[in-house]
Amino acid sequence: MFYYLIAPLKNKTPPLTYFSKEQHPKGALVNIDLRNKTLLGVILEEVSKPSFECLELEKTPYFLLPFQIELAAFIAQYYCASLSLALSLFTPFKKCDIAKLEKIEPDLSALSQTQTNALNALQQHSISLLFGDTGSGKTEIYMHLIAQMLEQKKSALLLVPEIALTPQMQQRLKKVFKENLGLWHSKLSQNQKKQFLEKLYSQEIRLVVGTRSALFLPLKELGLVIVDEEHDFSYKSQQSPMYNARDLCLYLAHKFPIQVVLGSATPSLSSYKRFKDKALVRLKGRYTPTQKNIIFEKTPNFITPKLLEALKQAIDKNEQAIIFVPTRANFKTLLCQNCYKSVQCPFCSVNMSLHLKTNKLMCHYCHYSSPIPKICSACQSEVLVGKRIGTMQVLKELESLLKGAKIAILDKDHTNTQKKLHGILNDFNAQKTNILIGTQMISKGHDYAKVSLAVVLGIDNIIKSNSYRALEEGVSLLHQIAGRSARQISGQVFIQSTETDLLKNFLEDYEDFLQYELQERCELYPPFSRLCLLEFKHKNEEKAQQLSLKAAQILSLCLEKGVTLSSFKAPIEKIASSYRYLILLRSKNPLSLIKSVHAFLKTAPNIPCSVNMDPVDIF
């Protein structure tokens, strides 16, 4: 008999011992009985025969690869989650016949001398940051790196934010890597996922392009991971375990012979600080040089005569425009002009957004909706006005001002399926659309030859927010959106902001901003300090507060040297009827943070809380 310690998947139960008449390797997936249910579990290790009676396991053809087991253990430790939960993230491997590995002869574009120098520099490091201006040709460098890896009969992974998986990018990669390319994202059907995995098991797919969950796929002989748009917040999971896929890639490179390249036109301040003196590869200028004129308009209004004229000129020249708006719907909030009270969600401490198309107010946190009121509930005034314009309102106003113009929207409300997303982008690429209005989705990796005008509205709402990353997020967005225009023809960038004097300093070179921000960023925040956020919530506000107070008392006894603690009500006090209290831990040493949290979780296992290591924001 053989005895094994097994972690049940998708279950909070700690590892348990089972027996088998056969020997099994570490990482094998097996069926186990637990509380009258059959669950999948992962073999962690072989153990001695215990003193108690055990149930028998049942083998399956699936198993986790060594790098997956190593990564799961790190996730559990660093992000303070159960090992079972961490292992549940991974897709297992299945033995099958290996497809004949054909010699790959990709049809690659020749690199410029600048790109060749960057490629050679990247090859000198196992971990590096490719800091390349928008339009400088980062994707061509990625493709050369990937081709070299596939020629060595290894596999490669290109991680991208969800929206960056555009039809354009897919066609570009498909043309070069043909049947060796596989795409992985959240909108694949179960049948599509099954077909993808069969090709991955047989190693017919050797290049995976996907969103953050693609990191958990069973990629055999993984030799290269590229994290494009490494600054993007979507690499950070907001559900436990709250991992950051970018940071997990860096860990993989330290433990396995895997090359990792982070890429961005606007790298995060943390990555810039980490790499600036060692493995930062700078790629300046555009691959196709064009002229770009930047216009600032210091106004609180939106569709101004000056902006309208710029849009008309672009359309008259048979060119295209993109318009960034930070808010979807018609307006961010509905405000009474008499008592200045806004309409709040009854279940969340946030204002409800105005959606005129459905004639409803909607909460973008819990999705509660209600009819648009005709009078103010506080003072009975009938003068209710929408504030903070959204994508739908910009569309509505432009349709009345630009008769005959073809205008589309790219936001979460309009791209709930892959088909809709591709339809919007394909129409814009085919120039069936004159103007594309969008939220942050519009800033991600789109490359359209006829875009001569990029418009930025409402950027002040981002740079004046309470986040410690507010200015970084705002300036990064400006560069990303500005980079969508004048890629192959000359054009202009139109920015509405009251902070023109500040922003003008940073629009030539993003590195100027990064150096400025390194001087200005408070040392209590990343990249100078590490943070860990603990959230306590309850339907009863008093009980939520008591949970956090009790936790703070216990935590204060568990803190390692150099760790500080602050406890407070969450900036958004209530979400989905649950009141929220936060504890923020700070330290220069991440190991001290991790030890402190693990000690607390061990001491107070009955206090429910969620742990967010390295949060991207505090809300």
Q: What residue spans do the PLM features occupy?
A:
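Accessory, non-ATPase domains that flank or precede helicase/AAA+ motor cores in DNA-metabolism machines
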Residues: 1-264, 270-272, 276-288, 448, ...
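A general secondary-structure junction signal
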Residues: 45-47, 91, 325-327, 411, ...
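Inter-lobe coupling/hinge segments of SF2-like helicase ATPases
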Residues: 127-150, 154-206, 210-543, 582-583, ...
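Short amphipathic beta-strand starts and helix->beta connectors
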Residues: 514-522, 559-571
